[in-house]
């Protein structure tokens, strides 16, 4: 096993060195160290053993390529082979970012569903761009993500696994996350990626595993053969709409029971499609990263913040914003203050403290505020973007709303957010 010492220097391919400062963490494949690189603190992932020529060459290609998006902690430099191993340099994880697995064990919690949806959209966007670039990730699991619990900002790590689609990199994946065809010895590819993605997304929302329920509890010992079955071709989705034999246990899988009940029907049906028997056995039937992203963007438009919440902590997802709404946490009725109707027909629900996102952007441009005027409360919208908004009243008068300014919302008002996007205000 190859481990490094504080103060030790490691040579980089193409020239330069890093100096080991301290260990940050370790896993089954390697150890991550904080290092000094040209006077700046960075991270070095160092493999416990030499992973072979195929893996090394693939890592070299990744270092020389452009990351699909800023969400990827992409390999910056690769080391020379030394001390019977090698590694690569990447940026350090910023403070406030946690591994996805920390959310499963309640070491940290998401602030609200806005942050969960934001994380989900970022995950889907990242892998959509990766796949459009002709790459597959090949080893998608809960250890690949660092997430900010407050806002859902996301970083994707372990990008040494990334390889050209349908190319053998020497990596198969992690048990409980691999597609059935990979469990059976197939080469990971984009279609196996999207199956692993569905597992990750289910775990993000349910904080539980989609293939663990009453059936899997029957096994006292999970041998390799049993695991290959229950997480491979024999996998039964816990909420399968036809086969209820693997339903979550009410106590052991408490999170799954509670959170499934909070899910809107559209999200339930998406998981049933993406993780059902048809998708397990037939890769062409799987939901794509683009389909997932579009669903989460739609759910974000319809996200409701409970008026009883002091901030944004109590929010919930719905499918029909025109129906009678009740907060699942406090049980009180909720009224939508206003809708924004965009040119493409989509509607955006506004309730107090609700953030406004345009299209699939990962940056909010506004937030709904409640203010008092003439002895009554009214809903307003605050501009938090860098653009001045053009506001047209129902009578045709034009006003300009600068950054941080708030305007009361009136029925029939039209807001031009930028050169491409205009919405009409509909007061409920």
What are these regions (language model features)?
Residues 193:
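Conserved catalytic-loop aspartate of Hanks-type protein kinases
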Residues 2-38:
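ATP-binding glycine-rich phosphate-binding loop
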Residues 73-119:
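Conserved structural core of kinase catalytic domains
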Residues 168-185:
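Conserved activation segment of eukaryotic-like protein kinases, specifically the C-terminal portion
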Residues 127, 131-149:
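Catalytic-loop of the protein kinase fold
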Residues 392-428:
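C-terminal boundary/linker segments immediately following FHA domains
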Residues 201-268:
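Conserved C-lobe activation region of Hanks-type protein kinase-like domains
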Residues 47-69:
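The N-lobe alphaC helix and its flanking beta3-alphaC-beta4 segment of protein kinase-like domains
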């Amino acid at each position: 096993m190859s481990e490094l010492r504080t103060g030790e220097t490691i040579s980089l391919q193409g020239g330069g060195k890093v100096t080991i400062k301290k260990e940050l963490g370790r896993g089954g494949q390697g150890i991550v160290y904080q290092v000094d690189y040209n006077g700046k603190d960075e991270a070095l992932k160092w493999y416990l053993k030499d992973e072979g020529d195929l893996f090394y060459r693939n890592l070299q290609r990744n270092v020389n390529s452009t990351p699909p998006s800023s969400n990827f902690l992409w390999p910056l430099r690769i080391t020379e082979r030394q001390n019977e191993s090698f590694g690569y340099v990447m940026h350090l994880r910023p403070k406030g970012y946690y591994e996805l697995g920390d959310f499963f064990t309640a070491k940290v919690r998401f602030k609200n569903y806005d942050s969960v949806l934001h994380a989900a959209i970022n995950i889907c966007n990242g892998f959509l761009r990766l796949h459009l670039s002709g790459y597959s990730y090949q080893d998608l699991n809960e250890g690949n993500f660092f997430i900010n619990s407050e806002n859902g900002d996301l970083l994707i790590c372990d990008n040494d696994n990334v390889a050209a689609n349908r190319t053998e990199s020497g990596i198969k994946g992690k048990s409980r996350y691999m597609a059935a065809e990979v469990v059976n010895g197939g080469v990971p590819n984009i279609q196996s990626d999207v199956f692993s993605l569905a597992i990750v997304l289910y775990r993000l929302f349910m904080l539980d595993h989609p293939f663990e329920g009453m059936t899997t509890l029957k096994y006292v010992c999970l041998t390799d053969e049993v695991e290959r079955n229950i997480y491979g071709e024999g996998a039964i989705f816990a909420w399968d709409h036809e086969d209820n034999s693997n339903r979550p246990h009410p106590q052991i899988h408490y999170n799954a029971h509670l959170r499934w009940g909070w899910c809107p029907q559209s999200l339930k049906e998406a998981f049933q499609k993406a993780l059902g028997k048809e998708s397990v056995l037939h890769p062409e039937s799987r939901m794509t990263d683009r389909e997932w992203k579009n669903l989460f963007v739609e759910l974000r438009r319809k996200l409701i913040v409970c008026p009883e919440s002091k901030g944004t902590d109590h929010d919930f997802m719905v499918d029909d914003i025109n129906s009678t709404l009740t907060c699942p946490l406090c049980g009180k009725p909720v009224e939508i203050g206003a809708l924004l109707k965009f040119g493409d027909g989509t509607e955006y629900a506004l309730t107090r403290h609700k953030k406004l996102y345009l299209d699939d952007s990962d940056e909010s441009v506004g937030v709904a505020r409640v203010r008092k005027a003439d002895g009554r409360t009214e809903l307003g919208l605050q501009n938090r973007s860098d653009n001045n908004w053009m506001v047209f009243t129902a009578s045709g008068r034009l006003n300009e709303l600068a950054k941080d300014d708030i305007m009361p919302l009136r029925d029939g008002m039209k807001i031009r957010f930028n050169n491409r996007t205009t919405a009409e205000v509909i007061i409920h």
